[in-house]
């Protein structure tokens, strides 16, 4: 397999995402990846439904997706880039840092969230990303995050 083959993935359905990420229901926050540009950028999709468990308490009368789950969706989209770049889906991607997090608008059931992630820097197994979450093209959240790739046998 060539280097290009291990780092390029134009899109990923849920089956491919589950090969890249260890997360499962109810904590898998990315339903689909519609674009991955090598190890530089990706766009992940989350279709928000009222049937998700966090809406039973956040908030029953006016459900709003918790901001921390938007951050998690950003991190998982970034994690898919890291996992695909490494060419070894057996590695773990640990979410390490969050900076400059801002929540601009509420996300509610029925929304389709796009997680736009862009790699800013990579040094060894440490990756830094800028992430935007958008609904209908409008910015709803943003953050700078850091991740670290760890082999499962070292976790």
Curated annotation (Swiss-Prot):
Keyword flag Endoplasmic reticulum: no
Gene Ontology terms describing biological process: fatty acid biosynthetic process; lipid A biosynthetic process
Any single Gene Ontology cellular-component annotation: membrane
Coiled-coil regions listed: none
EC number: 4.2.1.59
Pfam families linked: FabA
Subcellular location: Cytoplasm
Keywords (A to Z) from UniProt: Cytoplasm, Lipid A biosynthesis, Lipid biosynthesis, Lipid metabolism, Lyase
Family matches, as InterPro entries: FabA_FabZ, FabZ, HotDog_dom_sf
Residues in the signal sequence: none
Enzyme class: lyase
GO MF annotations, alphabetized: (3R)-hydroxyacyl-[acyl-carrier-protein] dehydratase activity
SUPFAM superfamilies the record matches: Thioesterase/thiol ester dehydrase-isomerase
Catalytic reactions of this protein: a (3R)-hydroxyacyl-[ACP] = a (2E)-enoyl-[ACP] + H2O
Residues at the catalytic site: 58
Family: Belongs to the thioester dehydratase family. FabZ subfamily.
NCBIfam families the UniProt entry points to: fabZ, PRK00006.1
Function as written in the Swiss-Prot or TrEMBL entry: Involved in unsaturated fatty acids biosynthesis. Catalyzes the dehydration of short chain beta-hydroxyacyl-ACPs and long chain saturated and unsaturated beta-hydroxyacyl-ACPs.
Name this polypeptide is given: 3-hydroxyacyl-[acyl-carrier-protein] dehydratase FabZ
Native species: Rhizobium etli (strain ATCC 51251 / DSM 11541 / JCM 21823 / NBRC 15573 / CFN 42)
């Amino acid at each position: 397999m060539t280097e290009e083959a291990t780092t390029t993935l134009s899109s990923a359905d849920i089956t491919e995402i589950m090969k890249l990420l260890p997360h499962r229901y109810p904590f898998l926050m990315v339903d689909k990846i519609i674009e991955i540009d090598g190890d530089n950028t990706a766009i992940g999709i989350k279709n928000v439904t009222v049937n998700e468990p966090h809406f039973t308490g956040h908030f029953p009368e006016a459900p709003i997706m918790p901001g921390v789950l938007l951050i998690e969706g950003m991190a998982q989209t970034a994690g898919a880039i890291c996992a695909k770049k490494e060419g070894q889906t057996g590695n773990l991607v640990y979410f390490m840092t969050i900076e400059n997090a801002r929540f601009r608008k509420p996300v509610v059931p029925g929304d389709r969230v796009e997680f736009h992630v862009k790699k800013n820097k990579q040094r060894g197994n440490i990756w830094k990303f800028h992430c935007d979450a958008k609904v209908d093209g409008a910015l709803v959240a943003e953050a700078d995050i850091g991740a670290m790739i760890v082999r499962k046998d070292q976790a």
